[in-house]
Amino acid sequence: MVRIDFEEGKILWSYKLDDICKDRKPLAGEGSCTVGFSAPISVARDVLYAGTLDGRFSAHSTVNGNKLWEFDTLRGYQTVNGNPAAGGSIDAAGPVIVDDWVFINSGYSQHGQMGGNVVLAFSIK
């Protein structure tokens, strides 16, 4: 992930993901584990929210790119209606920000990625 000053043509900061797929393969099931940002990012209050193909969801400072926090979505969940569900790859749709909440879809299984299908909500207060 890179922040660029388009007027000056300079890279202001960059953030590189660690490759953790070797350790995640047992969790990936039949899906493939790929490292990378693929879904669009979202920004609110100088914080950038981004999901990865290997199931990580993180918040970063827009000033310097430093990671503020990270949540691993590749796991099982008990949903609000009592059904079990699983998270996985974050791809296609980016985080949606409404008021003091960020919503993310985890478990996008297209193109052989790690399936599941949950919507997760994070408070940004």
Language-model features and meaning:
Residues 1-37, 42-92, 96-125:
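Extracytoplasmic/lumenal domain signature
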